[in-house]
Amino acid sequence: MSNDFMLEDDENYDFEFEDDDDDMIEPYVDVENCYYNSKSLKEENPESALTSFYSIVEKCEGEQNEWAFKALKQITKINFQLKKYDDMLQSYQRLLGYTNWLSITKNYSEKSIYNIVEYASSCENTEFLEKFYDVTTKALQNLNNERLMLKVLMHVARFLLTQKNYHKFKYLLRQMHELLSDENNSVADQNRGTHLLELYSLEIQMYSDIEDNKRLKELYQSSLRVKTAIPHPRIMGIIRECGGKMHMQENQWSEAQTNFFESFKSYDEAGSSDRIRVLKYLVLANMLSESEINPFDSPETQPYKDNPHIIAMTKLVEAYQIRDITAVERILQTYQHDILDDDFIRQYVDKILYSIRSQVLIELVKPYTSVKLSLLAKKLGVSISIIEQALVGLIIDERVNGKIDMVNEVFTISQPKNTIHNQLVEDVQKLWNTATK
């Protein structure tokens, strides 16, 4: 599964110097005019805007005036957009210190800080992000704002996942679980459920990377117990994908198919490219469940049937459903890059081949009372040993009734007891009819 869970495309956070600065205006006319004049400069002349905003900060800071807070927030944003990261961190640290001013409401300061965190998280400079998150979390520990702390820690956790820094990630997990515990009343019940699901989705990504299937199963079961939540669809996509993989490991193909379908719909709703990967898994589970329904018949999946990244799976399922072994093997060979490069799919390819061979084998032996294994092997284009293995599996699963003569390499069909009984009754009836004529 993908480790990138930044949600840039899924959440429309406006960072274009939002107009929420206008909701705390006090009658400082000269400062107010200077502030709006500075804002008018930032698009065409950001350097001049910076100088002007700094003058406001120096003029109003001693009075703990909200205009100083507003100006410093604009300075922080401009520095970030100009990629002046050191200057941005300096102004940001200063801004964090202003959040305790009595003139700044808790909701306004929280909204302002989180808006900066949200946008800065899109930065690709990992060295800057490490410093930025460190500055933010240290400051928030002193602000006693657990709601904001939780939202920020989610961003930090996503960043640590992309860096595969699992040691720090696990430390953050403990912090976030404490914040989301039932004993903590700072988070509303509905929000707690939503945050829990997001936290589980992050954990699932980490434990998927390190292939801890036991922990993944526990997380999946825990996520299903969360009832009061309105999660982002991508979060549900991750959780349902995990569920599908868990069912696949236990050979529960139909359940896996259901979970992959739900995962696909969630990723699709979120506009995530992960929908393509999970759609391949859905097709895989569909074949292994030996379903007669084409997975591309549904209105949700049909638009992707001819997608260049899906066409290999489209051809594969079509060949599979008409039991064309030769075509299945040819498609697997031709589209190795699209199919076998996925580690998850690759581990089930042998099961696909076994499944289709078994289905064809069942049809092949039906006309016979006994048949040479060599004949079956020739018709399927495989070795006698593969035929033996397939027949043994079918006998164990009670899909065919017969026995294998390993010495003479012959498979003999055994009639079910009720069939033998019915045949005997029919034969006796014929004898009686003949005798009484």
Swiss-Prot record:
Compartments, as annotated in UniProt: Cytoplasm; Nucleus
Domain PCI, residue spans: 249-418
GO (cellular component) term, any one: nucleus
GO biological process: DNA damage response; protein deneddylation
Coiled coil segments of this chain: none
Record's keyword annotation contains Transmembrane: no
Main location, first listed in the record: cytoplasm
Entry's Gene Ontology molecular function annotations: inositol hexakisphosphate binding
Keyword vocabulary terms for this entry: Cytoplasm, Nucleus, Signalosome
Function comment: Component of the COP9 signalosome (CSN) complex that acts as an regulator of the ubiquitin (Ubl) conjugation pathway by mediating the deneddylation of the cullin subunit of SCF-type E3 ubiquitin-protein ligase complexes. Required, indirectly, for activation of ribonucleotide reductase through the degradation of the protein spd1, thereby supplying deoxyribonucleotides for DNA replication and repair.
Family: Belongs to the CSN2 family.
Subunit organization: Component of the COP9 signalosome (CSN) complex composed of at least csn1, csn2, csn4 and csn5 subunits.
UniProt name for this protein: COP9 signalosome complex subunit 2
Gene it is expressed from: csn2
